[in-house]
From Swiss-Prot:
This is Prefoldin subunit 2. Its main location: nucleus. It comes from the Eukaryota. Keywords: Chaperone, Cytoplasm, Mitochondrion, Nucleus. One of its GO terms (biological process) is positive regulation of cytoskeleton organization. It is found in: Nucleus; Cytoplasm; Mitochondrion. InterPro entries: PFD2 (IPR027235), PFD_beta-like (IPR002777), Prefoldin (IPR009053). The keyword Ion transport does not apply.
Amino acid sequence: MADSSGRVGKSGGSGAGKGAVSAEQVIAGFNRLRQEQRGLASKAAELEMELNEHSLVIDTLKEVDETRKCYRMVGGVLVERTVKEVLPALEGNKEQIQKIIETLSQQLQAKGKELNEFREKHNIRLMGEDEKPAAKENSEGAGAKASSAGVLVS
């Protein structure tokens, strides 16, 4: 893998390069993944609200005369149209928003799995998280010793 400077991560030939990831790097990677997940969730919530607004407008416009004037914002400009012209465009937009929300949901699930795998790989525990289940699983032999070497993230 290449880091942000474009260099491939390898040690100076000592063979200890694989386990040389510092706790700060692990925390930075974990926080980056969490931020990406929050961004996806935020965008999905924003689109859900927009979808609800579209549904509300569509339901309202279905009840009025098709020749009635209505106004629509197009590229920052308010344009006068008729209900007959606007309704199909709104329904098309609503379908596109639904597709985008589905895609974001899939990406959010994938990011959640990636985050959990990262946590397990680097033994990351969040502050306030219950440590009793982890102690039960690792109570055999050297497993208890390995669990104390994890990274604690606030």
